[in-house]
C-alpha cells in the first residue's frame, strides 16, 4: 500500500509539473520597442507601460523605450522574430494597424503566428482632424469640399496606402462616391509627422487615432471633426461628434498592446502575463491610460492570441474589398 501511495504522489507531481508554467523573476533589463518615430501611437503605448510598471514597482529600473521605424511596424516585427526572438525583457507595441498590415502580408515572410501575443492596454478610436483655423467646421464640410473637388484636399496619416489610416479615409471617400484610389493621400512614418505637416499647412486633414491628438486638444491648433466610435465618448471628449451622428457609417476601434519574440521562454512570458493582469487593475495604470486617451480593453495571453488572430482574418476580408489582399 505504501508503495502504491508513493507512486501515486510521484505521478501527481509529474503531471502537475508538466502542465503548470511558473512565472520567472522580473527581467533585470526591460525594453519597449515602438515601431515608428517618436510622437505617435506606438510611442504612447510604450510610455504608458513604462510609467505604470515603475509606479507600481513591478520593475525596479526604468524601462527603456527604443524607436524602430520602418515599414509601419514591419522592421520591428522582422527584427524580433529573426534577430531577437528570445529576449525575455523586450516587448513590442502593436495596434490595430499592425494587425491590418499582417492581414495583407506586409510584414514579409512572417505572419500572425510568428510572435507571442502578450497583452492589450486599451482601445483607441479613429478620427479625422483639421487645423483649428480650417474653413471646415464639420465632417460634412470637409467631405462636401472633397466630393466637389477631390484634388483640393490632401489627407495625411502616419501609415501607407492600405493601412488602417488609409482604410478609414477610403471608407469616407467611398461614402461620398469618390474612388479611394484617386484621393490625394500622403503617408508619413508615425503619428507625429502628419500633425506637423497639418500645422505647417502642407495637408488639409489628418486621418489617425484620437489618442495621438490628445496633446493638441487642450490648445487652439487642432480641431477633431469626428471620432469613429459608436457613440460619443465621455468626459472631456464628449464635445467631439461621431462620424455616425453626422451620417457616415464608420466605426473604427483600435486595440493597443504588446507582443514578444517567438522563443521567449514560457516562464518569462508568464511573468509578463501575470504582471499585466495585476497592472491593469491598479489605479496607477488606469490613470496613465486615461491621460493618454485610451479606453479599457484588457486581454492577456491566450485570450489576446485568439482575439488577434480573429481580427487579422476580419481585416483580411476588408482589405480584399479594396483589392489590397488576396
Residue spans for each PLM region:
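An extracytoplasmic/periplasmic, membrane-proximal ligand-sensing/linker region
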Residues: 266-326
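C-terminal lobe and pocket-closing loops
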Residues: 212-281, 310-313
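Bacterial N-terminal signal peptides that target proteins for export
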Residues: 1-9
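N-terminal (or domain-start) structured segment
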Residues: 23-114, 161, 178-205, 296-299, ...
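N-terminal signal peptide c-region/cleavage motif recognized by signal peptidases
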Residues: 17-23
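Short coil/turn segments
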Residues: 37-39, 96, 131-136, 158-163, ...
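Hinge/capping helix and adjacent helix->loop/strand transition within the periplasmic-binding protein
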Residues: 26-27, 55-59, 79-90, 102-193, ...
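Ligand-binding pocket segment of bilobal, Venus flytrap-like solute-binding proteins
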Residues: 69, 152, 157-160, 164-239
Amino acid at each position: 500500500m505504501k508503495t502504491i501511495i508513493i507512486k501515486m504522489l510521484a505521478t501527481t507531481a509529474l503531471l502537475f509539473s508538466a502542465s503548470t508554467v511558473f512565472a520567472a523573476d522580473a527581467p533585470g533589463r526591460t525594453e519597449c520597442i515602438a515601431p515608428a518615430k517618436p510622437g505617435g501611437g506606438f510611442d504612447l503605448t510604450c510610455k504608458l507601460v513604462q510609467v505604470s510598471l515603475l509606479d507600481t514597482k513591478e520593475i525596479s529600473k526604468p524601462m527603456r523605450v527604443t524607436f524602430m521605424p520602418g515599414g509601419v511596424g514591419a522592421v520591428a516585427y522582422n527584427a524580433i522574430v529573426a534577430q531577437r526572438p528570445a529576449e525575455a525583457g523586450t516587448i513590442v507595441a502593436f495596434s490595430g494597424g499592425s494587425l491590418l498590415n499582417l492581414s495583407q502580408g506586409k510584414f514579409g515572410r512572417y505572419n500572425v503566428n510568428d510572435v507571442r501575443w502578450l497583452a492589450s492596454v486599451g482601445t483607441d478610436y479613429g478620427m479625422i482632424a483639421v487645423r483649428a483655423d480650417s474653413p471646415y467646421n464639420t465632417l460634412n464640410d470637409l467631405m462636401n469640399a472633397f466630393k466637389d473637388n477631390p484634388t483640393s484636399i490632401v489627407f495625411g496619416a502616419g501609415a501607407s496606402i492600405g493601412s488602417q489610416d488609409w482604410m478609414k479615409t477610403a471608407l469616407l471617400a467611398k461614402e461620398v462616391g469618390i474612388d479611394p484610389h484617386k484621393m490625394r493621400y500622403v503617408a508619413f512614418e508615425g503619428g507625429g509627422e502628419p500633425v506637423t505637416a497639418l500645422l505647417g499647412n502642407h495637408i488639409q486633414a489628418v486621418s489617425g487615432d484620437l489618442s495621438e491628438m490628445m496633446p493638441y486638444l487642450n490648445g487652439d491648433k487642432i480641431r477633431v471633426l469626428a471620432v469613429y466610435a459608436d457613440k460619443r465618448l465621455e468626459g472631456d471628449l464628449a464635445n467631439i461628434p461621431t462620424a455616425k451622428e453626422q451620417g457616415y457609417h464608420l466605426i473604427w476601434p483600435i486595440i493597443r498592446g504588446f507582443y514578444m519574440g517567438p522563443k521567449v521562454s514560457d516562464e518569462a512570458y508568464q511573468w509578463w502575463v501575470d504582471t499585466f493582469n495585476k497592472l491593469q487593475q491598479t489605479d496607477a495604470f488606469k490613470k496613465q491610460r486615461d491621460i493618454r486617451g485610451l479606453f479599457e480593453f484588457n486581454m492577456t495571453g491566450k485570450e489576446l492570441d485568439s482575439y488577434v488572430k480573429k481580427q487579422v482574418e476580419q481585416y483580411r476580408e476588408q482589405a480584399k474589398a479594396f483589392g489590397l489582399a488576396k
